Every structure is written in structure tokens, then in C-alpha cells.
């Protein structure tokens, strides 16, 4: 992600509402990134693991982070990184809040 211009701010942010794997900045955007790994597709693709329930949990945790950091009015988005073996897929703006 750093090679793509992301500035990594925090790994494994945790609060009482949940966890976010990676928080970064991409230009003006604060990016909340979920990273999912699968050695193979027997358990489904890593991207399928970020279901609606997981998305809501990430969203609530991100809003908590922004409030905690007094960043309520900054633009943000939710990206997902799927890793299958050696293949890495980045989906920018994978879901909304």
C-alpha cells in the first residue's frame, strides 16, 4: 500500500467497538482497510469474508476512531485487501457506511 502512495497511520487499531486492520491516508482521505488472507479458496475468497455484518462493525469502529481523533469532518473510505496465496487484490471504496 505504501508503494501505491498510502501513508500508514496505524496497524491493528482496537477500541471497545472492534478492530481495524489498517488505518492510512490516501491523499485527503482517511482509509480504513480490512485485510483478509486465505491460503486457497476452499473457505471462500478473502473478499467474501467481509460481509455486511463485518462492514457495519468496521464502520462503527472507524467512526469511533474519527471522533476520538477529532476528525469528524474528514473524507474517509473503506478499502479491502484480499490475499490469496501470493495474489493481492485491493478494492478501493469497497463498501460505504
Map each language-model feature to its residues.
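Short, conserved glycine- and acidic-residue-centered signature motifs
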Residues: 50-55
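A generic beta-sheet turn/junction motif
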Residues: 15-17, 26-28, 84
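A short acidic/basic microdomain associated with nuclease active sites
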Residues: 3-16
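Solvent-exposed, charged helical/coil patches
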Residues: 2-4, 42-45
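Domain-level recognition of nuclease-like catalytic cores that cleave nucleotide substrates
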Residues: 68-97
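Conserved catalytic cores of phosphodiester-cleaving nucleases, focusing on short active-site segments
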Residues: 20-44, 58
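A short, N-terminal amphipathic alpha-helix
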Residues: 60-67
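Structural motif
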Residues: 17, 30-32, 75, 88
Amino acid at each position: 500500500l505504501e508503494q501505491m502512495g498510502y501513508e500508514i497511520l496505524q496497524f491493528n487499531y482496537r477500541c471497545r467497538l472492534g478492530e481495524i486492520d489498517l488505518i492510512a491516508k490516501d491523499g485527503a482521505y482517511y482509509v480504513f482497510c480490512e485485510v483478509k488472507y486465505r491460503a486457497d479458496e476452499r473457505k471462500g475468497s478473502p473478499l467474501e469474508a467481509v460481509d455486511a455484518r463485518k462492514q457495519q462493525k468496521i464502520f462503527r469502529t472507524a467512526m469511533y476512531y474519527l471522533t476520538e481523533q477529532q476528525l469528524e469532518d474528514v473524507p474517509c473510505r473503506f478499502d479491502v485487501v484480499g490475499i490469496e496465496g501470493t495474489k493481492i487484490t485491493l478494492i478501493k471504496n469497497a463498501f460505504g457506511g
